[in-house]
């Protein structure tokens, strides 16, 4: 088997994780107590869904996942929620005091005490796998736990499981809405680790997803649950081909191979279509061409950044439901003729498509309508540099005055780390700039490590 272990860190990671496992269970017909009436091979782990669930002899299906937080309240909701019987108590790890939105607390003082316990639990899950293919890591970089403990854990995973791929689903701070004043510091420090220790990072941002909920689902005041269910659909689409047998299956490492032209250029934009509310669904039957066009709309992007301002380097389209390759080819051909969708000159083809015949499932009583077919797009575009330059700008404004820095230094961090991380991000922005420029004159090798100051 090619198993995948999911690691959910901090409030954002745990809440997105909740939404994901809720959806996986519905998709596979697994009950909240872990039993699966439709599973004929009890205790035998050779079904496709066993990449994400392990099975006990009694026929209980247990997610291959760990939930970690430095304070208990959010994970306690899992411990007492609908799916409390699904998880083994050891998979839910909490500390006693939180990281207080401080990267240094998550990475040095408090995170350091809990990280070995986390790694032990992950090791137990890994030992239970026959052919572990990688990790999915869910966190946000604005707070303290997701950024600090997340970075620490990724560093340690690189040491322990060097060759396994690590995909990050990372919530980045939004341009207008902030939950903490020190978000820019935490984000810059954490991205420094994401750059080195993840193979692919999919960037999400709450504001962009709020807008999608408001615009497409007519939810006036979206809650985190609304947001997370939408994120769960994206993640479910990406992992569908690992969990179901399909026509064009896509492996975790395949994302990496097809989307990452240079090791550092691995921050992805994602979008999902169709996002329609149950009321509207009765009147619209969306064709493959329509949902494909909709996935390329700037308004569908799950991070606030406009792909029209950049060029695409590569793009993955994951279809699910009633879709045939012929329609996909036609839709992609149409996209290629559009002037607004530009590819870099050194990547003329740039499309990888996957098709999975399992139609999208929706959470009963949720906001999304049940549809026949859906598509999720992950793209590597130079426009994502907008997200970094926005955060860097905010970082510079605060750091010029050394505002709030004492909280970080007081937790045992050195001030030099700030400037080191900031320089790394400046180099990253420069890399993106170089990758997007015409490459006739060079030999196409720039952008590999260009822009080190």
Curated annotation (Swiss-Prot):
* Residues annotated as binding GTP: 11, 71, 140, 144-145, 179, 206, 228
Chain coiled-coil ranges: none
Domain of life of the native organism: Eukaryota
An example GO CC term for this entry is: microtubule
This chain's function reads: Tubulin is the major constituent of microtubules, a cylinder consisting of laterally associated linear protofilaments composed of alpha- and beta-tubulin heterodimers. Microtubules grow by the addition of GTP-tubulin dimers to the microtubule end, where a stabilizing cap forms. Below the cap, tubulin dimers are in GDP-bound state, owing to GTPase activity of alpha-tubulin.
What PANTHER family does its record include?
TUBULIN (PTHR11588)
Would you tell me the protein name for this molecule?
A: Tubulin alpha-1/2/3 chain
Specify the species.
Answer: Naegleria gruberi (Amoeba)
Q: Which gene encodes it?
A: TBA1
